[in-house]
Protein backbone atom coordinates (compact mmCIF):
# COMPACT_ATOMS: atom_id res chain seq x y z
CA UNK A 1 0.00 0.00 0.00
CA UNK A 2 1.70 3.18 -1.15
CA UNK A 3 -0.94 5.65 -0.07
CA UNK A 4 1.56 7.42 2.18
CA UNK A 5 4.64 6.78 0.04
CA UNK A 6 5.58 10.46 0.02
CA UNK A 7 6.34 10.49 3.75
CA UNK A 8 10.04 10.62 4.66
CA UNK A 9 9.72 7.59 6.94
CA UNK A 10 8.17 5.60 4.09
CA UNK A 11 10.90 6.72 1.68
CA UNK A 12 13.59 5.62 4.14
CA UNK A 13 12.02 2.18 4.38
CA UNK A 14 11.69 1.77 0.61
CA UNK A 15 15.24 2.99 0.02
CA UNK A 16 16.62 0.61 2.66
CA UNK A 17 15.56 -2.48 0.73
CA UNK A 18 16.90 -3.22 -2.75
CA UNK A 19 14.34 -5.59 -4.30
CA UNK A 20 14.59 -6.76 -7.89
CA UNK A 21 10.94 -5.85 -8.27
CA UNK A 22 8.93 -3.41 -6.18
CA UNK A 23 5.14 -3.58 -6.38
CA UNK A 24 3.04 -0.72 -5.09
CA UNK A 25 -0.73 -0.65 -4.83
CA UNK A 26 -2.99 2.31 -4.19
CA UNK A 27 -6.61 3.23 -4.65
CA UNK A 28 -5.56 6.88 -4.73
CA UNK A 29 -2.43 7.28 -6.90
CA UNK A 30 -3.17 10.92 -7.69
CA UNK A 31 -2.14 12.72 -4.55
CA UNK A 32 -2.98 16.13 -3.13
CA UNK A 33 0.53 16.39 -1.62
CA UNK A 34 2.15 16.56 -5.10
CA UNK A 35 4.11 13.33 -4.53
CA UNK A 36 4.37 11.36 -7.79
CA UNK A 37 3.69 7.73 -6.95
CA UNK A 38 3.96 6.78 -10.62
CA UNK A 39 7.53 8.12 -10.76
CA UNK A 40 8.46 6.07 -7.69
CA UNK A 41 7.68 2.94 -9.74
CA UNK A 42 9.26 4.18 -12.98
CA UNK A 43 5.79 4.74 -14.44
CA UNK A 44 5.19 0.97 -14.70
CA UNK A 45 1.51 0.24 -14.21
CA UNK A 46 0.78 -3.47 -13.88
CA UNK A 47 -2.98 -2.98 -13.68
CA UNK A 48 -5.29 -0.06 -13.25
CA UNK A 49 -8.97 0.06 -12.46
CA UNK A 50 -10.89 3.20 -11.62
CA UNK A 51 -13.72 3.62 -9.14
CA UNK A 52 -16.51 3.64 -11.72
CA UNK A 53 -15.15 0.55 -13.45
CA UNK A 54 -14.70 -1.32 -10.14
CA UNK A 55 -18.32 -0.57 -9.26
CA UNK A 56 -19.52 -1.75 -12.68
CA UNK A 57 -17.66 -5.05 -12.14
CA UNK A 58 -19.25 -5.43 -8.68
CA UNK A 59 -15.84 -5.29 -7.00
CA UNK A 60 -17.08 -2.66 -4.54
CA UNK A 61 -20.27 -2.40 -2.61
CA UNK A 62 -22.67 0.22 -3.94
CA UNK A 63 -23.06 3.40 -1.93
CA UNK A 64 -25.04 6.61 -1.84
CA UNK A 65 -23.25 9.85 -1.10
CA UNK A 66 -25.10 12.84 0.30
CA UNK A 67 -23.48 16.19 0.90
CA UNK A 68 -25.24 17.98 3.74
CA UNK A 69 -24.74 21.57 4.78
CA UNK A 70 -23.72 21.87 8.40
CA UNK A 71 -25.76 23.90 10.84
CA UNK A 72 -25.04 27.55 11.68
CA UNK A 73 -25.05 28.41 15.39
CA UNK A 74 -25.18 32.03 16.57
CA UNK A 75 -24.61 33.11 12.94
CA UNK A 76 -21.33 31.15 12.87
CA UNK A 77 -20.84 28.34 10.36
CA UNK A 78 -19.42 25.16 11.86
CA UNK A 79 -16.12 23.89 10.48
CA UNK A 80 -12.96 22.12 11.58
CA UNK A 81 -11.57 25.28 13.17
CA UNK A 82 -14.74 26.15 15.08
CA UNK A 83 -14.71 26.72 18.80
CA UNK A 84 -15.03 23.34 20.51
CA UNK A 85 -18.26 24.36 22.24
CA UNK A 86 -19.86 24.98 18.84
CA UNK A 87 -18.68 21.61 17.48
CA UNK A 88 -20.53 19.78 20.24
CA UNK A 89 -23.39 22.19 20.79
CA UNK A 90 -26.70 20.48 21.67
CA UNK A 91 -28.30 21.99 18.55
CA UNK A 92 -25.59 20.56 16.31
CA UNK A 93 -25.80 17.11 17.89
CA UNK A 94 -29.59 17.07 17.39
CA UNK A 95 -29.12 18.35 13.82
CA UNK A 96 -26.65 15.55 13.02
CA UNK A 97 -28.97 12.93 14.52
CA UNK A 98 -31.92 14.26 12.50
CA UNK A 99 -29.86 14.16 9.29
CA UNK A 100 -28.56 10.63 9.82
CA UNK A 101 -32.10 9.50 10.59
CA UNK A 102 -33.39 11.27 7.45
CA UNK A 103 -30.88 9.55 5.17
CA UNK A 104 -30.98 6.22 6.96
CA UNK A 105 -29.04 3.03 6.35
CA UNK A 106 -29.46 -0.36 4.75
CA UNK A 107 -30.42 -3.33 6.90
CA UNK A 108 -32.12 -3.98 10.23
CA UNK A 109 -30.10 -1.51 12.26
CA UNK A 110 -27.33 1.02 11.90
CA UNK A 111 -23.66 -0.01 12.01
CA UNK A 112 -21.98 3.37 11.60
CA UNK A 113 -18.65 5.14 11.61
CA UNK A 114 -18.57 8.86 12.35
CA UNK A 115 -15.33 10.70 11.60
CA UNK A 116 -14.54 13.87 13.56
CA UNK A 117 -11.49 16.12 13.83
CA UNK A 118 -10.55 16.05 17.49
CA UNK A 119 -10.30 13.49 20.28
CA UNK A 120 -12.36 15.68 22.62
CA UNK A 121 -15.02 16.04 19.93
CA UNK A 122 -15.24 12.26 19.49
CA UNK A 123 -15.59 11.71 23.24
CA UNK A 124 -18.21 14.45 23.69
CA UNK A 125 -20.24 13.38 20.63
CA UNK A 126 -20.21 9.78 21.88
CA UNK A 127 -21.38 10.89 25.31
CA UNK A 128 -24.18 13.04 23.85
CA UNK A 129 -25.34 10.32 21.43
CA UNK A 130 -25.41 7.84 24.33
CA UNK A 131 -27.55 10.28 26.33
CA UNK A 132 -30.00 10.21 23.41
CA UNK A 133 -30.35 6.41 23.44
CA UNK A 134 -27.60 5.33 21.04
CA UNK A 135 -24.82 2.89 21.90
CA UNK A 136 -21.53 4.46 20.84
CA UNK A 137 -17.86 4.72 21.71
CA UNK A 138 -15.01 7.03 20.78
CA UNK A 139 -11.76 5.64 19.37
CA UNK A 140 -8.60 7.57 18.59
CA UNK A 141 -5.07 6.67 17.62
CA UNK A 142 -4.39 6.16 21.33
CA UNK A 143 -6.70 3.13 21.49
CA UNK A 144 -4.98 -0.25 21.70
CA UNK A 145 -5.47 -2.89 19.03
CA UNK A 146 -7.55 -4.83 21.56
CA UNK A 147 -9.84 -1.84 22.19
CA UNK A 148 -10.22 -1.26 18.45
CA UNK A 149 -11.03 -4.91 17.78
CA UNK A 150 -13.56 -5.06 20.62
CA UNK A 151 -15.28 -1.94 19.28
CA UNK A 152 -15.34 -3.30 15.72
CA UNK A 153 -16.73 -6.64 16.96
CA UNK A 154 -19.46 -4.83 18.90
CA UNK A 155 -20.29 -2.66 15.89
CA UNK A 156 -20.64 -5.78 13.73
CA UNK A 157 -22.77 -7.59 16.30
CA UNK A 158 -26.55 -7.66 16.25
CA UNK A 159 -26.76 -8.42 19.97
CA UNK A 160 -28.77 -6.16 22.26
CA UNK A 161 -26.60 -3.30 23.48
CA UNK A 162 -23.97 -3.61 20.77
CA UNK A 163 -22.55 -0.44 19.27
CA UNK A 164 -24.53 1.65 16.80
CA UNK A 165 -21.66 4.02 16.06
CA UNK A 166 -17.95 4.42 16.54
CA UNK A 167 -16.77 8.03 16.65
CA UNK A 168 -13.22 8.10 15.38
CA UNK A 169 -10.26 10.41 14.95
CA UNK A 170 -7.22 9.52 12.84
CA UNK A 171 -8.00 5.80 12.55
CA UNK A 172 -10.21 3.76 10.20
CA UNK A 173 -9.35 6.21 7.39
CA UNK A 174 -7.90 3.50 5.18
CA UNK A 175 -7.41 -0.23 5.01
CA UNK A 176 -10.34 -1.04 7.26
CA UNK A 177 -12.70 -3.96 6.73
CA UNK A 178 -15.92 -3.84 8.70
CA UNK A 179 -18.41 -5.46 6.30
CA UNK A 180 -21.55 -4.56 8.25
CA UNK A 181 -20.88 -0.82 8.19
CA UNK A 182 -23.92 0.68 6.50
CA UNK A 183 -23.48 4.35 7.29
CA UNK A 184 -20.43 6.62 7.26
CA UNK A 185 -20.71 10.20 8.47
CA UNK A 186 -17.93 12.73 7.88
CA UNK A 187 -18.05 15.53 10.43
CA UNK A 188 -14.54 16.62 9.49
CA UNK A 189 -12.99 18.05 6.34
CA UNK A 190 -12.17 15.58 3.59
CA UNK A 191 -9.94 15.84 0.54
Language-model-derived ranges and their functions:
Residues 113, 121-173:
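Conserved helicase ATPase core of P-loop NTP-dependent helicases/translocases
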Residues 31-35, 74-76, 176-177:
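Switch/connector loops and helix/strand junctions flanking conserved nucleotide-binding motifs
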Residues 1-4, 12, 174, 186:
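Residues immediately C-terminal
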Residues 3-65:
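Post-DEXD/H (motif II) to motif III coupling segment of the RecA-like Helicase ATP-binding lobe
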Residues 25-29, 118, 169-171:
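A short beta-strand-to-loop transition that corresponds to the Sensor-1 phosphate-sensing loop
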Residues 164-189:
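A short beta-strand element within the Helicase C-terminal
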Residues 18-21, 44, 60-63, 132-135, ...:
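Short glycine-/polar-rich loops that comprise or flank the Walker A/P-loop
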Residues 44-116:
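Conserved interdomain linker/interface between the two RecA-like ATPase lobes of SF2 helicase motors
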